[in-house]
Amino acid sequence: MEKNTIILAAGQGTRMKSKLYKVLHQVCGKAMVDHMLTQVEKTNMDHIVTIVGHGAEKVRELLGDRTEYAIQEQQLGTGHAVLQAEKILGDKDGMTMIVSGDTPLFTAKTFENLFEYHRQKGAAATILTARTENPFSYGRIVRNEVGVVSKIVEQKDATTEEAEIKEINTGVYCFDNQKLFAALHQVKNDNAQGEYYLPDVIGIMKDAGEIVAAYEMADFSESMGVNDRLALSKATKVMQRRINEEHMVNGVTIIDPENTYIDYGVEIGPDTIIEPGVQIQGNTKIGSSSVIGAHSKIVDSTIGNRVTVTSSQIESAIMHDDSNIGPHSHLRPQAEIGEFAHVGNYCEVKNAKLGARTKMGHLSYVGDADLGTDINIGCGVVFVNYDGMNKHHSTVGDYAFIGSNSNIVAPVTIADHSYVAAGSTITNDVNKFEMGIARGRQVNKEGYFKKLPVYDAALKAEEENNK
């Protein structure tokens, strides 16, 4: 039997107060509609149709050919939105599930259970329901004395007795595909908003004597919809807890899960330790037995095994096995740190490679350069790579030594086994076994201190200290 899904993603989302299309707002690094599509894909659909309207091109750009699309030109209600999929699904048999693109917390397991329950019941329609102690604002599921669904009643229309019902409509449905579109053509818009509502299909099917079932899901939190920034924050918190728990189950130590922020899709190996305040975002992979120190931020990067990151920021970079960085250093895009290499405190690396066992202890900048293995970079070294118009590249060979407070003015090549004396500004190549030294010769002027303004201040301080 064919399985289809329609994702409703045409709403404008005015309550978000945003220029960004509502379903494109992110929850843990992934757009809400992308979360939904990912879970739907896991249930092996024959057809997936996304209903788009406002912001259609941006949704298409994000989701690509993972789904088919139908356009709702006018916002005339959820029933009208589903009807736009008829030209794609109208001649199909089987089952069709309808979900919303602004409910990012649903799981594939819940959808699989819904399809199976619908099939077992032989129903024309199955409503996905949940129980909550605070059902206010949700439609209530009214059942008869034998547990069969009688109707869905909205909050504003509920009697006092009906308002006490804890079972609510999550807004997800599974239908017999042919009966769905037949019923949609009978939906009227004789309401205050002049819209065609999808839940009216349930009443039409009941009146026609069709079987209408309800499957109660286990976790109410999955059904959380996002209509404003407050709900977005709540959904993000639920998703973050889910992500962190999955990593911990898989062998990752997260010291403070409530204050650790890991995007959906991030990969972390076992025995890695994540300290409080860490943010791990985008397409990031972290190996095993690494330590990500407090308040570090890692974005779109690959971190190897046994790597230590101490309070540093890493973006679009690579750290190979057994390397370390920090505290308070920054790897910018296209930085690559070799095995056992060391980047200490207050350093920055951009579009540059540090080879294995190369050490860069403190207060240095390496940009647009290739550095070999076993190099020592002293304190305050700067690779001068920009002439005001263009970036230029430098190369440093294996076993070289770059003395403190040196400037390497690109483009230059510093060969294997060469030495740059501290305080030098290097503008020419340094060959193998050579020492490059480029600094003014020191001259000591006898008695000159007494001619300087600071001399009087120093005498006064000395007199005060000797009293």
From Swiss-Prot:
PROSITE patterns listed in its UniProt record: HEXAPEP_TRANSFERASES
Keyword NAD: no
Region (Linker), start-end ranges: 230-250
Region (Pyrophosphorylase): 1-229
A Pfam family that the UniProt record links to this protein: Hexapep
GO molecular function, one term: magnesium ion binding
Cofactor or coenzyme needed: Mg(2+)
Main location: cytoplasm
EC number assigned by the record: 2.7.7.23, 2.3.1.157
Signal peptide: none
Manner of cofactor binding, per the entry note: Binds 1 Mg(2+) ion per subunit.
Keywords: Acyltransferase, Cell shape, Cell wall biogenesis/degradation, Cytoplasm, Magnesium, Metal-binding, Multifunctional enzyme, Nucleotidyltransferase, Peptidoglycan synthesis, Repeat, Transferase
Gene3D superfamilies: Hexapeptide repeat proteins, Spore Coat Polysaccharide Biosynthesis Protein SpsA, Chain A
GO cellular component: cytoplasm; membrane
Broadest EC class assigned to this enzyme: transferase
Reaction it catalyzes: alpha-D-glucosamine 1-phosphate + acetyl-CoA = N-acetyl-alpha-D-glucosamine 1-phosphate + CoA + H(+); N-acetyl-alpha-D-glucosamine 1-phosphate + UTP + H(+) = UDP-N-acetyl-alpha-D-glucosamine + diphosphate
Binding site for acetyl-CoA: 385-386, 404, 422, 439
Cellular compartments annotated: Cytoplasm
GO biological process: cell morphogenesis; cell wall organization; lipid A biosynthetic process; peptidoglycan biosynthetic process; regulation of cell shape; UDP-N-acetylglucosamine biosynthetic process
Entry's family note: In the N-terminal section; belongs to the N-acetylglucosamine-1-phosphate uridyltransferase family. In the C-terminal section; belongs to the transferase hexapeptide repeat family.
Known role: Catalyzes the last two sequential reactions in the de novo biosynthetic pathway for UDP-N-acetylglucosamine (UDP-GlcNAc). The C-terminal domain catalyzes the transfer of acetyl group from acetyl coenzyme A to glucosamine-1-phosphate (GlcN-1-P) to produce N-acetylglucosamine-1-phosphate (GlcNAc-1-P), which is converted into UDP-GlcNAc by the transfer of uridine 5-monophosphate (from uridine 5-triphosphate), a reaction catalyzed by the N-terminal domain.
Subunit structure: Homotrimer.
Name of the protein in question: Bifunctional protein GlmU
Native organism: Pediococcus pentosaceus (strain ATCC 25745 / CCUG 21536 / LMG 10740 / 183-1w)
The encoding gene: glmU
